């Protein structure tokens, strides 16, 4: 469960993180870097796609500056992931907390801008 989020920091299950991360079902990858910083591409989420969650949540940053192209969302869905939720990171945290107990879910968060 995500306990809190503020610009540059997220608290998950009692632990604080200050770098972009991916929450998998059984672990947290806390060094998530994208090839192009504020632009996400298929290579940046290959491991997520390989795990085929039912839901992928993408937090685009405090101000929502990370870009998620519609073409990428289409490619994600065509890979078998049923639902893709793209929101500013604060809103994405709320979505994650609503869904994580009842769905096979993975969430990727940009924590700053």
Feature map (PLM): residue ranges:
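Generic secondary-structure microfeatures
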Residues: 21-27, 52, 60-62
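Terminal leader/tail segments of proteins
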Residues: 4-5, 30, 51-58
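A short acidic, glycine/proline-enriched capping/turn motif at secondary-structure boundaries
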Residues: 62-65, 91-93, 113
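C-terminal structural segments of small proteins and small subunits
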Residues: 79, 83-108
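Non-catalytic interface/targeting segments
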Residues: 1-42, 97-113
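Short amphipathic alpha-helical segments and helix-helix/interface helices
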Residues: 45, 72-74, 93-96
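A short, acidic, amphipathic alpha-helical segment used as a generic capping/interface helix at domain edges
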Residues: 40-50
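Mid-chain, well-packed structural core segment of small domains
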Residues: 53-87
